[in-house]
């Protein structure tokens, strides 16, 4: 009966359900987590980003569109407090939130293999979108994090900007998102069930626990 009701839920009803009071409280917390990770990597020039941990967590707890908003707000704040370079990458963060959120909604966070599949899908989609922005907006490198050093090294070796940007972005995102998904998975699993919304309980609890 519950599944039948969920299938009949319209997009607007689903959107309204995602933006619950709990979700509105979680958004600034998730954005804060993203800002800490992103600012730290930017300041230390690390070849990582770590600015989507909160986005992944809230995708599990509240849904894809709340996660997309979290990603957008994160990049807007990073552009204001760290570097304007982050602003165009808002699209990447939104994409990450939607991809992760819908895969979580499909129940893929219930098992480790599903988490791995979600990580790979998110990493690949982010690599494609971020690489296009890096190439067409910034000419191949941004200089914000240590990732630009990797890209510059590959460009010097291959003499091909497109191949270099996509290759470095793929490597960096696989590593970065592996860390982000691992941390997010641990956080979500550590949250007591009574504090989870019905969405989070349905999307992340193991089937054998129901």
How would you label these PLM feature ranges?
Residues 2-61, 65-76, 84-86:
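Hydrophobic transmembrane alpha-helices
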Residues 74-81, 137, 141:
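Regular secondary-structure segments
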Residues 71-79, 98-102, 106, 205-210:
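Extended, non-catalytic scaffold segments that flank or surround catalytic motifs
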Residues 64-69, 73, 107-113, 161:
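Membrane-helix interface segments
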Residues 43-49, 86-88, 110-210:
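Membrane-embedded alpha-helical hairpins and interfacial helices in multi-pass inner-membrane proteins
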Residues 2-36, 88-139, 185-189:
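Short helix-perturbing small/polar motifs within transmembrane alpha-helices
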